[in-house]
């Protein structure tokens, strides 16, 4: 078991405690005498700090929740998942402050435990608006966005770099509840299936993993914009600098060969809805870490590709999208619009914190300019 068990400190500061309670009470629904396991990643790997799991455990113990810790490695460490599974046998809830919580998150769980993947990677994130915005408010915002998108016949998407595609919505089934592992904070609506997606997507800066499975190289960096041409959810080719196109095609072949999957499939897409999401390090330091932190910010729409399943293996990150439904913008230049559609207006009226959040978004996204 983790040494953190012996290191639970004094109560965290008020904002950090509020973020912890938001997760424990509003997301997990825990109560006194419940049993909690916090699976936390080795801080030396650079994705999670030590202070956030400590703060969560401190607040849980103060609430009368029996708390245990286990430290794990990264997603490429096969033993980590086994270690976490063994440690969770007698608990009611598992909170993953570790990337292994994201692996195969779309699979259906069979043990009825509450499982939560925490994207607040450090104490600063947990204490910020990202961690403190009421979980129920974000759930209602997600539902409102789903109402608009899933009720549409066609959605139009563009971006300043030249992305221009439409997506026809054909009887997509509404998902109630989250994937097998709940996500905290709530950051994206239901993914829109790309079977009816036609147009082109500007690929810029990086191709990154979706977090579903671990592979190497995890990302591809490039300087020139490449356009992916898509027809009915299939990649039909790339346009742009010859060498860069070759690099993109090679990366797709590498990843698809590793898993024996369809490299041409564009499975689904969604855009961020949590304006508190921040990434204060340069994306170039670790493009994988960047994209898997910042994807919940409304300034990004991301597209799941390479694999005919959710969420695929390679992600396209589209900066500052405009997403239009019936001639009205749901996102405009990377800002989620609360006023254009009745479901969002109603959510904002019920939860004024949503208007405050959108009026004061985080623009720390790891990119300059």
What are these regions (language model features)?
Residues 1-227, 231, 325-369:
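Active-site bordering "gate/hinge" segments
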Residues 155, 199-201, 267-269, 301-303, ...:
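A broad, low-specificity signal marking well-ordered, structured residues that form hydrophobic/aromatic
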Residues 197, 224, 265, 297-299, ...:
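A generic structural signal for well-ordered coil/turn residues at beta-strand boundaries
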Residues 221, 237-238, 243-304, 349-365:
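Dual-mode signal for accessory low-complexity, basic/Gly-rich regions
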Residues 288-356:
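Internal helix-turn-beta structural module
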């Amino acid at each position: 078991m983790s040494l953190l068990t012996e290191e639970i400190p004094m109560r965290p500061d008020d904002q950090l405690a509020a973020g912890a309670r938001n997760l424990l009470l509003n997301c997990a629904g825990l109560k006194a005498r419940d049993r909690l396991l916090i699976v936390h990643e080795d801080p030396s790997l650079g994705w999670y700090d030590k202070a956030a799991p400590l703060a969560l455990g401190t607040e849980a113990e103060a609430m009368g929740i029996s708390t245990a810790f286990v430290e794990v490695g990264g997603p490429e460490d096969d033993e980590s998942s086994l270690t976490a599974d063994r440690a969770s046998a007698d608990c009611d809830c598992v909170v993953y402050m570790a990337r292994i919580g994201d692996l195969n998150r779309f699979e259906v769980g069979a043990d009825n435990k509450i499982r939560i993947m925490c994207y607040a990677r450090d104490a600063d994130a947990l204490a910020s608006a990202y961690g403190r915005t009421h979980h129920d408010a974000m759930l209602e915002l997600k539902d409102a966005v789903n109402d608009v998108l899933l009720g549409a016949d066609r959605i139009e998407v563009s971006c300043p770099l030249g992305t221009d595609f439409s997506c026809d919505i054909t009887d997509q089934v509404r998902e109630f509840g989250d994937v097998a592992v709940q996500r905290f904070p709530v950051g994206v609506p239901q993914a829109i299936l790309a079977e009816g997606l036609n147009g082109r997507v500007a690929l810029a800066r990086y191709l990154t993993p979706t977090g579903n499975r671990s592979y190497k190289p995890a990302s591809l960096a490039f300087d020139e914009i490449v356009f992916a041409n898509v027809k009915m959810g299939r990649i039909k080719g790339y346009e742009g600098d010859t060498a860069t196109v070759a690099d993109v095609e090679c990366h797709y072949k590498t990843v698809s060969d590793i898993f024996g999957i369809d490299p041409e499939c564009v499975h689904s897409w969604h855009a961020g809805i949590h304006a508190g999401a921040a990434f204060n390090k340069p994306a170039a330091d670790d493009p994988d870490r960047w994209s898997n932190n910042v994807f919940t910010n409304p300034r990004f729409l991301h597209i799941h590709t390479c694999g005919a399943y959710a969420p695929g293996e390679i992600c396209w990150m589209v900066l500052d999208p405009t997403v239009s439904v019936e001639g009205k913008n749901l996102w405009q230049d990377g800002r989620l619009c609360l006023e254009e559609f009745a479901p969002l207006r109603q959510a904002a009226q019920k939860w004024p914190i949503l208007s405050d959040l959108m009026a004061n978004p985080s623009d720390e996204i790891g990119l300059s300019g």
